[in-house]
Amino acid sequence: MPAVSSPAYGYLRITNLPFDEALARLEAGLAKEGFGVLCRIDIQAKLKEKLGVEMPRYVILGACNPPLAHKGLQQEMNLGLLLPCNAVVYEHEGQVVVGAVDAAAMLSIVGNPAMEPMARDVNERLRRAVDSVA
């Protein structure tokens, strides 16, 4: 799966799969890495409903790995402000993009060095889930 320019706060890849198949594979990849999908937000539909605007397909998955979330909350009670981990599938210029938040970048703002190993673990799992879409 080809890479796309990823922002400092995320990891993105382009896939040749149709949108719905990419979304299903991302959900399966997240599950394989221990994440459950807590919410699924269809941004295209919501913006059409609320603003009457058209945009390409865009779905956000709010994913949580319960053991890691529990461990993180034990180390940093306010971590809930940064949960769940978001993953996305969207259409851009005729391509389907799949991605996930960079947990290490996100958790760096917490300023708790004890969380760094967990952040790396979460990042590796999210990247494997994204890469599994290929």
Where on the chain are the PLM-derived regions?
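Compact, glycine-rich, soluble single-domain proteins
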Residues: G36-V88
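Short glycine-/small-residue-rich flexible loop motifs, especially phosphate/cofactor-binding loops
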Residues: E27, Q44-A45, R127
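Well-ordered alpha/beta subsegment
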Residues: I109-A134
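Beta-strand/loop substructures that line and gate deep hydrophobic ligand-binding cavities in soluble
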Residues: N86-N112
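Terminal, regulation- and interaction-focused segments at domain boundaries
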Residues: P2-E33, D131
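Conserved active-site and cofactor/substrate-binding residues in soluble primary-metabolism enzymes
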Residues: L17, E21, D42, P117, ...
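Short amphipathic alpha-helical/adjacent loop interface patches that line ligand
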Residues: L23, N65, N123-L126
